[in-house]
Amino acid sequence: MALIGKSERFSADFVMGGAAAIVAKSAAAPIERVKLLLQNQGEMIKTGHLIRPYTGLGNCFTRIYREEGVLSFWRGNQANVIRYFPTQASNFAFKGYFKNLLGCSKEKDGYLKWFAGNVASGSAAGATTSLFLYHLDYARTRLGTDAKECSVNGKRQFKGMIDVYRKTLSSDGIKGLYRGFGVSIVGITLYRGMYFGMYDTIKPIVLVGSLEGNFLASFLLGWSITTSAGVIAYPFDTLRRRMMLTSGQPVKYRNTIHALREILKSEGFYALYRGVTANMLLGVAGAGVLAGYDQLHQIAYKHWVQ
């Protein structure tokens, strides 16, 4: 067991994390597309790719259905699944790797150091994964915000994921695929640190006794953590996606501070939180990933022990 422990554990974490993510993200794809449109409508109106603003969650759902059809709720989902499988699976796997690397133990190092180790391992996992896979998130964002209601020529900007890469590389080069990457690392580090760190820290305190191994309890804990982390990190997500949408446009934000100033000046503070309600609903999918991964983890290691 000692010889195969590390390599098999890394592989199992990778596969189980990705499998849980694919199911949850595909189910939540309609909500995620609504969130992207609400969050980025200011930029879309500015560039002429949206005629009038969405007034809320219900209005956005209605207009997508009426103007684009049911299947359009899954527009960009292919890119999302391609992105999310390696992203989520790598996050779980790298989290375990960094956690073992730091080697913090609650019994040996005390609660505070153990908590800090959990937060650090979650943050490092998110940052490492993003370095390799950010361009896929860019493609997903561009497809998700590509509304049919366009005042430029009445057509969509992109035919599909390959077209996103082709047009972006042609107009902006590799840099265009990584626009907003800097602020993304800050936001992801904050979000993943809370997402993984708090879950790993609170789980052994809350999920004990009759609640140990309980899917509903694990799900509710995961939902509360993903919602809290998502709300805190949301402005960073808005900034990076707004910067993404300027690739291929004649006028771009010079940097994150410039983007923040321009958005606050023209749209106000609330613009940083547009779509946050939909994002909270997406926390249900995130909680499902955490709870599902936890259940798969228990089943797999029980099998290994036997």
Curated annotation (Swiss-Prot):
Positions annotated as Solcar repeat: 8-101, 113-205, 213-299
Gene3D superfamilies (UniProt xref): Mitochondrial carrier domain (1.50.40.10)
Keyword tags: Antiport, Endoplasmic reticulum, Membrane, Repeat, Transmembrane, Transmembrane helix, Transport
Compartment annotation: Endoplasmic reticulum membrane
SUPFAM superfamilies, A to Z: Mitochondrial carrier
Pfam families linked: Mito_carr
Renumbered ranges of motif Nucleotide carrier signature motif: 240-245
Record region (Important for transport activity): 240-245
PROSITE patterns: SOLCAR (PS50920)
Gene Ontology MF: a single term: ATP:ADP antiporter activity
Gene Ontology BP term (one): root development
Catalytic activities: ADP(in) + ATP(out) = ADP(out) + ATP(in)
PANTHER family, per the entry: ADP,ATP CARRIER PROTEIN 1-RELATED-RELATED, ADP,ATP CARRIER PROTEIN ER-ANT1
Family in the record: Belongs to the mitochondrial carrier (TC 2.A.29) family.
Biological role: ADP:ATP antiporter that catalyzes the exchange of ADP and ATP across the endoplasmic reticulum membrane.
Protein name: ADP,ATP carrier protein ER-ANT1
